[in-house]
Amino acid sequence: MSKRVTVLMGGFSTERAVSLNSGAAAGEALRQAGYAVTLLDVGRDVAAFIAALTQTRPDVVFNALHGRFGEDGAIQGILDIMALPYTHSGRLASAIAMDKPSAKLVFERFAIPVAPHVVADRASVLAETAMARPYVVKPLDQGSSVGVTIVTSETNDLPFSRDDWPYGRQVMVERFIPGRELTVGVMGDKALGVTEIVTDHRFYDYDAKYAQGGSRHIVPAPVAPEVFAQAQELSVLAHQALGCRGVSRADLRFDGETLYMLEVNTQPGMTDTSLVPEQALHAGISFPDLVTWLVETAQCDA
């Protein structure tokens, strides 16, 4: 009898559309692999969510949610209470990785290079007392580059100055690192490869990630062998330091001398053309095989 797998998708974060794509693609790949698949669009009604899982009682939950409440430990905590094995990282690793200041502390503890940064309220940023330009302003707990702004000497209109800016009073202010964008998928405790991301946008923002033609993925990244190896080593170390499991994706900047860890994504995109599945395929692992591995290694912290 095939395992019953419920795929969590959608949600109510700013990354809902991305999650719907990930869930649909993962669900289809799991069906191809022989699993009995149920797709569950997760909403704010927690009681309805618990009831749906209680009724179907899957053997494994495939978490294809992105953004707040899906990859920040909230859903993971509910699944732990219900004693349902689920894919990807547990609640603590998810919560730490999603909160940028907490993740930076972990990286620094393990001697993983990070850009100079500070947590500041928006008023101090607007008063130009937080950090000298150029710098990057990031919401503390959003993914997919949502709300990210690069502030240079030429920047006048600051979106986080508006009263309707929805991402909180405090922000992460980080020194802007010029250079190349690299990303490394980690599967278990092994790096899948290194990809260079090339875009005509100022940086790898939401549109560059998801709009047609917004970016190009170069696999493997055309960097020196020692840079390639170090990117993989730092990404595996970050995965382990945070306590991640399943797959994760580390994003780095390379300025020609130093690799800087930007963040680790515990719920990377899961379409067959997303970065981690793309790297897995280059390493000889098909998309159905990748999602199968995630299901077969699923855990919970009950």
UniProtKB/Swiss-Prot annotation:
Per the record, the pathway is: Cell wall biogenesis; peptidoglycan biosynthesis
Q: Which residues bind Mg(2+) 2?
A: E263, N265
- Listed GO CC annotations: cytoplasm
Binding annotation for Mg(2+) 1: D251, E263
Q: Which Gene3D superfamilies match?
A: 3.40.50.20, ATP-grasp fold, A domain, ATP-grasp fold, B domain
From the Swiss-Prot or TrEMBL record, state where the protein is found.
Answer: Cytoplasm
Task: State the EC number(s).
Answer: 6.3.2.4
Please list the residue ranges annotated as the ATP-grasp domain.
104-296
Q: Does the keyword Nucleotidyltransferase apply?
A: no
The entry lists its GO molecular-function terms as:
ATP binding; D-alanine-D-alanine ligase activity; metal ion binding
One GO-annotated biological process of the protein: cell wall organization
Q: What class of enzyme is it?
A: ligase
UniProt: ATP binding residues: 130-183
Which reaction is catalysed here? Answer: 2 D-alanine + ATP = D-alanyl-D-alanine + ADP + phosphate + H(+)
**According to the record, how does the cofactor bind?**
Binds 2 magnesium or manganese ions per subunit.
Keyword field:
ATP-binding, Cell shape, Cell wall biogenesis/degradation, Cytoplasm, Ligase, Magnesium, Manganese, Metal-binding, Nucleotide-binding, Peptidoglycan synthesis
- Keyword Methyltransferase recorded: no
Q: Which SUPFAM superfamilies match?
A: Glutathione synthetase ATP-binding domain-like (SSF56059), PreATP-grasp domain (SSF52440)
Which coenzyme or cofactor does it need?
Mg(2+); Mn(2+)
Q: Which InterPro entries match?
A: ATP-grasp, ATP_grasp_subdomain_1, D-Ala_lig_Van_CS, D_ala_D_ala, Dala_Dala_lig_C, Dala_Dala_lig_N, PreATP-grasp_dom_sf
Name the predominant localization: cytoplasm
Family note: Belongs to the D-alanine--D-alanine ligase family.
Role: Cell wall formation.
What NCBIfam families is this protein classified in?
D_ala_D_alaTIGR, PRK01372.1
In its UniProt entry, what is this protein called? D-alanine--D-alanine ligase
Question: From which source organism is this entry?
Answer: Rhodospirillum rubrum (strain ATCC 11170 / ATH 1.1.1 / DSM 467 / LMG 4362 / NCIMB 8255 / S1)
This protein's gene is called ddl
